[in-house]
Regions:
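Extended, folded cores of ATP/NTP-driven motor/assembly subunits in large transport
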Residues: 1-195
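P-loop NTPase motor domains
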Residues: 46-49, 61, 65-67, 162-219, ...
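Conserved lysine of the Walker
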Residues: 245
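Hydrophobic positions on the alpha1 helix immediately C-terminal to the Walker A/P-loop
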Residues: 248
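Post-Walker A helix-loop "phosphate-sensing" segment adjacent to the P-loop in P-loop NTPases
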Residues: 254-264, 279
Length: 628
């Protein structure tokens, strides 16, 4: 009486599902097409959503225009007459009704509108037990009631309502039966059009990282897809600790590696170590990095300015060198290369500057000699016997072009800011050169995690260099993903020029959970950056660890969408950047386990019941597959 039972047979087993139907009891007071999806998946109140498979059906028939026009005329004349008698004193609403019917008859007479008979029904499918059915019923009734839609269950008539969701059934006498039962509503065509069950969520790309929308629609993220009106493939990600940044980015890295491309990750905190080892990548600690600015040069005319810029940033991280400094430095770079080519060192550059300072050429130019002496002092720390000489005068640089994945852990350099700036800029130059030298159909990815620390450059030259690199990477199928903990690190007056350049030149922007206090301050300073709905939505984002999924806002140029990312327990273990998880894996590695075995044990430790259910499901389906 209160439901239908559907019998199914799958893999040699019988199973049943329960079918529940609900239809509209009366016309809603107000309805908008853009708000219709909130009836079954409310953005701000996710608990007001339908959590089971369902079919929402709108069956409509446009009534005869002449008949409805005549009906409107009669109705208007009757109400208009009553409104001018004592009847209106007892029923004050009659004047409003007369006005509405008068306007309706004008629209009907001019052909601007029509009267439509319609039947709105929702058919839900759930497990065949009373407890689940009651939960589904309450979900549906409460979700629609939130927006002013009153639904009722068709007692003893579930089969009739169920048939309406099947194709071509309404025209075979079923709609007439619905009319006779009094469950068909009437409204103007405009109002009925606003009841259409449309979901406007964008599926984004045909394939890629699966990230369902908040409306529970399939959506995929592929930053290299060309159909999103994006001007580049770069992505900026910001979210507080525990928001799920690492779990979101690591699948993107895997997709690039699986396509045959390469990825380089700048990290602080060993967050990508497990993934690197699982994927057979190269893991390098910042303390062991070795560079040589002249190592990969083949044409000094094309590379001289790049090396000059690198040495300029190393000499003055805050960007205090002027054009004369840089002109002299360019001469030193060219002279060093012409003398020793790839065997040239920073010592050769400093020697050239010393000889120039002592030469007769600048004997009468104390200003020039002063600049030469300044650069000699600033670059001395990077010579072979200088404080940081071991990092920049290597015969065999640490970075090799044959590695598909390289993770560079730079946390050990954080307490030496000058060295960190020099290393970071050298790495960015290396990445850009590798992107340019490899085939353009090969996907390339550079991930800069903890960008608020790694991109904290005061030197405007670094910002300009990053902006240029971010803009030109698209031509070589390259992408930069920059990650910070707070949107202020990207988009505020406090952000460095490099961070602002990364934000401004990223077509993809992902906003995860934010610090409530910091986000409120940001919205006060920049009230036009986010709409009220977006602020409320971001404020409701939870921690990925607590809710078992990541919530985020994806912005691609002017398009915005809301997504959730669900990750299986094995991937969660591999992607985890939590301290205890990291120590667990490292301890298992010391005990002799492989990285795969260590991650497997961590997955069982963190998500035992989930892993057990997945294994049981796999064994069951493998058994039936072998029987078939």
């Amino acid at each position: 009486a209160d439901y239908l039972t559907l019998g199914l047979r799958e893999n040699g087993r019988n199973s049943t599902a329960r079918i529940l139907n609900f239809h509209l009891a009366r016309n809603p007071e107000i309805a908008f097409l853009w708000n219709m999806a909130d009836n079954y998946s409310n953005l701000l109140n996710p608990e007001l959503s339908i959590s089971c498979p369902f079919i929402l059906t709108l069956t409509l028939v446009v009534e005869d225009q002449v008949k409805t026009h005549s009906e409107a005329n009669l109705k208007y004349m009757d109400l208009e007459k009553k409104s001018k008698t004592s009847y209106a004193k007892w029923f004050p609403s009659v004047e409003k009704e007369a006005k509405e019917w008068g306007e309706l008859r004008q629209r009907l007479g001019s052909g601007q509108s029509s009267v439509v008979s319609y039947f709105l029904n929702i058919t839900a499918f759930c497990k065949d037990n009373n407890e689940t059915a009651l939960e589904v019923e309450q979900d549906i009734l409460n979700s629609f009631r939130k927006n002013g839609f009153e639904l009722i269950s068709p007692r003893f008539n579930h089969m009739r309502n169920f048939l309406t969701c099947l194709p071509f059934m309404a025209g075979k006498g079923l709609f007439k039966q619905l009319k006779e039962a009094g469950v068909v509503q009437r409204a103007e065509s405009f109002n009925v059009a606003n009841l259409m069950p449309l979901v406007a969520d964008n599926p984004l790309t045909p394939a890629g990282l699966l990230a369902p929308t908040y409306r529970n629609q399939l959506a995929f993220i592929d930053i290299f897809f060309r159909g999103m009106n994006n001007t580049n493939y770069n992505m900026a990600v910001c979210g507080t600790s525990g928001a799920g940044k690492t779990g979101l980015i690591q699948p993107l890295i895997r997709s690039v590696l699986d396509s045959g491309g390469f990825a380089v990750v700048f990290d602080m905190g060993d967050g990508y170590k497990s993934l690197c080892e699982n994927m057979g990548g190269v893991y390098l600690d910042g303390e062991t990095l070795r560079f040589n600015p002249f190592a990969n040069i083949t044409d000094i005319d094309q590379s001289a300015e790049r090396v000059r810029d690198q040495l300029s940033v190393m000499a003055s991280p805050n960007g205090n060198l002027d054009e004369v400094h840089e002109g002299l430095l360019l001469q030193a770079v060219r002279a060093s290369w012409l003398a020793k080519e790839n065997r040239a060192r920073i010592d050769d550059v400093v020697d050239f500057l010393k000889n120039a300072s002592d030469s007769e050429q600048y004997a009468g130019s104390p200003t020039i000699r002063s600049r030469l002496d300044e650069m000699i002092v600033l670059l001395d720390q990077y010579t072979a016997n200088g404080t940081y000489g071991q990092y920049f005068n290597s015969d065999e640089p640490s970075l090799r072009d044959d590695a598909k994945m390289v993770v560079l852990e730079l946390g050990g350099l954080e307490d030496r800011p000058s060295l960190l700036v020099a290393v970071m800029f050298s790495l960015i130059i290396y990445i850009e050169n590798r992107m340019y030298r490899t085939p353009r159909n090969l996907k390339k990815l550079n991930v800069i995690d903890e960008g608020w620390r790694l991109l904290d450059f005061k030197n405007h030259k670094v910002g300009e260099f990053i902006e240029k690199g971010y803009r030109t990477a698209r031509r070589h199928t390259g992408a930069y993903i920059t990650i910070t903990q707070n949107i202020v690190d990207f988009d505020s007056d406090k952000a460095s020029s490099a961070a602002r350049a990364a934000w401004g030149n990223s077509s993809y922007k992902i906003i995860l959970r934010q610090s409530a206090k910091e986000f409120a301050k940001y919205n006060q300073l920049y009230p036009d950056q986010f709409q009220p709905l977006q602020r409320d939505m971001i404020g409701k984002f939870g921690a990925a660890k607590d809710q078992w999924f990541s919530s985020f806002l994806l912005q691609v140029e002017n398009h915005s969408s809301w997504h959730r990312l669900f990750v299986d327990p094995l991937s969660r273990a591999m992607y985890s950047s939590d301290g205890p998880d990291f120590e667990f894996v490292q301890q298992k590695r010391k005990e002799g386990l492989s990285i795969h075995e260590a991650v497997w044990q961590l997955a069982w430790k963190k998500s035992g019941p989930e892993m057990a259910s997945l294994e049981a499901w796999l064994e069951e389906h493998e058994k039936y597959r072998s029987v078939a």
